[in-house]
Amino acid sequence: MDLEARAHSEHPEALRLWLRLLTCTQLIEKQVRNELRSQFATTLPRFDLMSQLERSPDGLKMNELSRRMMVTGGNVTGITDQLVTEGLVERINVEGDRRAWRVRLTPRGRKLFHEMAQQHEDWIVEAFAGLSGKEISQLHKLLGKVKEHSHNQLMAETE
């Protein structure tokens, strides 16, 4: 039984919407994970790490990668070790800090990431194929309002 099915009709609409969003996210993410595994023999965390590095051609320090991916340093180290072994990323010493290094995509890693990213885009487009362009725009706009409100609430709480 998915999260949404557990909500009863007496629950507020906002709660039922939240559960629907979670369910949709879980279903789409599961599909993406399955496709990455079957087509590229990789995982979503590896794809995410490579995606972060693609956006930073000079590479990123491990702590910055960890922060951007919202995972522990140990997780980033484990994934990085695998990708280094496969020749998809490389470690580079950080000038002025003998204990730190940056990680960046190798040319081979960049080529593979571009292939995966194109497929990823296709999978996401397919996930929303049941909606018209207008519906996608409306949903994007509405979720933008939710995002802005949530962000503002969070900022108000941390002041």
Regions found by a protein language model. Give the residues of each.
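Base-recognition residues in the alpha-helical recognition helix of bacterial helix-turn-helix
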Residues: 19, 48-51, 77-79
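Alpha-helical linker/hinge and terminal dimerization helices associated
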Residues: 28, 32-35, 69, 112, ...
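C-terminal regulatory/oligomerization modules of transcriptional regulators
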Residues: 1-11, 133-159
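Residues within helix-turn-helix
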Residues: 62-63, 74, 81, 101
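Charged, amphipathic alpha-helical coiled-coil/dimerization segments
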Residues: 2-6, 81-141
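N-terminal leader segment of winged-helix/HTH proteins
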Residues: 1-40
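N-terminal helix-turn-helix DNA-binding core of bacterial DNA-binding proteins
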Residues: 26, 30-72, 86, 154-159
